[in-house]
Amino acid sequence: MHQSGPAGLSGLCRVTDHLYLSNGRAANDPSQLTRGQITCIVNVTETKSSCPPPPGVEEYIHIPVSDSPVSPLRDHFDQVADKVQHTAERGGRTLVHCNAGVSRSAALCMAYLLKHRGVTLLEAHGWVKTCRPMVRPNNGFWEQLIGYEMELRGCNSVRMVPSSMGQIPDIYEEEAKNMMPL
């Protein structure tokens, strides 16, 4: 189905041949961007980088969304998914990053896989988690992804369920049973 490249906490993680995921530190490291042959950067943090992109990066898109369950990340699913696809069709590579490379950027990579790779949300999560094991979109982004999957596929592979910590995606249900509420 896919090949992935885990890169640890600080590197670029290859989701597909044309889509990479990282944290802000890696996204601002010119040597990593050059090595990864990144041509487009999607920055999903509240602040725009003050560093100019290195040679080879032709496009820089800033989407100032906070990592809050009420942030409207869904408003950007199609824009980012289509940009990744368009860049891939031109032979380029897109890096999607947020501060930690865990929630916002992971959710956008999952949205791309849903829309352009035809996988379910459950499969998209597994795919991205294989590439970057620490991914965990916040619950609000999960709700938005679930709605997006319903819009694209007419059914859902993940659902929100009640837990001692509030509503969570069912894929975290077993994990949540072992946690104590604060």
Regions found by a protein language model. Name each.
Residues M1-G11, E59-H62:
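Intrinsically disordered, low-complexity PEST-like regions enriched in Ser/Thr and acidic residues
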Residues L19, R93-L95:
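Residue-level preference for the first positions of well-ordered beta-strands
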